[in-house]
């Protein structure tokens, strides 16, 4: 069952409108806002440089010129709150649209790109989010009211993208070897996270929201970033490969590797992370030389992803990852399997 929760956005929108006029919230009102937006608060309070207290401050001070938070995330959220107030009529129109959406229709299309027997039971929390257009967290989704709802199809594509992440995460959580690797606080953890991010975002982009990699189908700022990625594609793939090489060194520093991963997996402009683009290009290449079923199997067998991609890349003339690095990634899983058996 897939449902939509719009209460958080409704309550926060009313709060932002009142606050922008200089009306300080009563304690009871603040608690109502926080309770209705608990999912949003829990997601962001785990990010570096963001706390529950700083989120509350941003909600209350977003419209004050002197409020300049150091965190780029808080800065983006404040900008989003200001935009929501300015575009209040569009926000209300988006809410009205969302009241008429039938979420279960979306599920069938997403299941086609996930392993058999993937349960897709989730909640779509509508947010007012100037940093993330959409995100998946603990089996549920956030989707920003700030996005342009051009059509039902466009909205369904955005939700499908995040819902695919929910299904993907279901299998990650049931893979004890991968779970162990993802909690090592080591270079190996970063290597596995990087490969997993390329696969997860690549599948969601290519299969569920393909318009996100077409310049003519996206807003101007997004199209500009997409164009720059296309022009620098080989350099970006080289950065991805260098991250693997760095993370796979025996003496790899976890913090340094993590920072390099964030540079590829997060876009602080809130537009399009590099890893999303590279992953989509990888799945596109694989789709030309491998059956869809084989690509979907990588969700449960992550170690097969890079070898399978390299096979297709060699045939199509795309970027090929260093075979020795690809083999090292495979060996990580084999070594962990022996250790855990």
Q: How would you label these PLM feature ranges?
A:
Residues 144-159:
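Short pre-active-site segment immediately N-terminal to the catalytic Zn-binding motif
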């Amino acid at each position: 069952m897939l449902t939509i929760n719009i209460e958080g956005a409704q309550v926060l929108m009313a709060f932002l409108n009142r606050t922008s006029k200089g009306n300080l919230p009563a304690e009871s009102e603040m608690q109502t806002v926080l309770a209705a937006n608990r999912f949003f608060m829990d997601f962001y309070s785990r990010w570096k440089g963001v706390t529950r207290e700083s989120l509350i401050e941003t909600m209350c001070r977003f419209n004050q010129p002197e409020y300049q938070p150091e965190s780029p995330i808080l800065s983006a959220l404040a900008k989003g709150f200001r935009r929501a107030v300015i575009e209040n009529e569009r926000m209300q129109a988006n809410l009205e649209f969302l009241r008429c959406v039938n979420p279960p229709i979306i599920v069938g299309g997403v299941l086609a790109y996930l392993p058999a027997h993937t349960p897709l039971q989730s909640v779509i929390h509508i947010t007012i989010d100037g940093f993330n257009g959409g995100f998946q967290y603990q089996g549920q989704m956030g989707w920003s009211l700030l996005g342009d709802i051009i059509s039902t199809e466009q909205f369904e594509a955005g939700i499908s993208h995040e819902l695919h992440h929910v299904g993907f995460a279901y299998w990650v959580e049931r893979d004890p070897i991968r779970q162990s690797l993802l909690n090592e606080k080591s270079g190996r953890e970063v290597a596995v996270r990087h490969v997993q991010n390329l696969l997860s975002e690549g599948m969601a982009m290519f299969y569920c929201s393909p318009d996100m990699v077409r310049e003519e189908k996206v807003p101007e700022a997004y199209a500009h970033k997409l164009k720059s990625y296309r022009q620098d594609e080989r350099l970006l793939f080289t950065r991805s490969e260098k991250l693997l090489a760095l993370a796979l060194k025996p003496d790899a520093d976890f913090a340094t590797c993590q920072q390099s991963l964030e540079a590829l997996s997060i876009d602080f402009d809130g537009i399009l992370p590099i890893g999303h683009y590279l992953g989509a290009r990888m799945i596109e290449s694989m789709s030309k030389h491998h059956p869809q079923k084989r690509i979907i199997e990588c969700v449960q067998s992550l170690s097969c992803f890079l070898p399978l991609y390299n096979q297709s890349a060699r045939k199509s003339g795309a970027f090929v990852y260093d075979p020795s690095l690809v083999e090292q990634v495979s060996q990580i899983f084999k070594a962990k399997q022996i250790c855990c058996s």
